[in-house]
Amino acid sequence: MRTLMIEPLTKEAFAPFGDVIETDGSDHFMINNGSTMRFHKLATVETAKPEDNAIISIFRADALDMPLTVCMLERHPLGSQAFIPLLGNPFLIVVAPLGDAPVSGLVRAFVTNGRQGINYHRGVWHHPVLTIEKRDDFLVVDRSGTGNNCDEHFFEEDERLILAPHQ
């Protein structure tokens, strides 16, 4: 099994998979009589159908045991999905490019700095949320509507990957 190299999350490296939601290096303008900086349109919510809705939820995630064997990835073909950390903790991201199925050799891993969120583009393969802390909270912006919006792909045993953030 291949061990994933964990990269620091940057806008450039993550661009094939989605958006990095952060203020560092992002354009802004002043509002509210000059008392507030607005970092505008850091990500776009994607939905497949006009009758779909963008919704906001909170996910409370428990940490998985590490090192983790990455056995599966999922994708949301009908909408984007954003994760914004509420407690300021770094978290892990495992992604693969768009396609009918994820290719094990193209899977990448990232770690946030705790002040970054991410927005997976519609159809991007990714691992379910991976917190480093024992428990963590995330603001999630995604799609509500009819139709199946979660495809799962389970890797064959020889395609599985190892995620070991502390090695």
Swiss-Prot record:
E.C. numbers: 4.3.2.3
State the signal peptide span: none
- A Gene Ontology molecular function term of the record: ureidoglycolate hydrolase activity
CDD domains reported for this sequence: cupin_UAH (cd20298)
Task: Note whether Lyase occurs among the keywords.
Answer: yes
Pathway membership? Nitrogen metabolism; (S)-allantoin degradation
Give a yes or no for keyword Lyase in this entry. yes
Q: One biological-process term from Gene Ontology?
A: allantoin catabolic process
Q: What is the annotated role of this protein in its UniProt record? A: Catalyzes the catabolism of the allantoin degradation intermediate (S)-ureidoglycolate, generating urea and glyoxylate. Involved in the utilization of allantoin as nitrogen source.
Listed HAMAP family:
Ureidogly_lyase
NCBIfam families, alphabetized? PRK03606.1-2 (NF002949), PRK13395.1 (NF009932)
Q: How does it assemble?
A: Homodimer.
- What protein is this chain from? Ureidoglycolate lyase
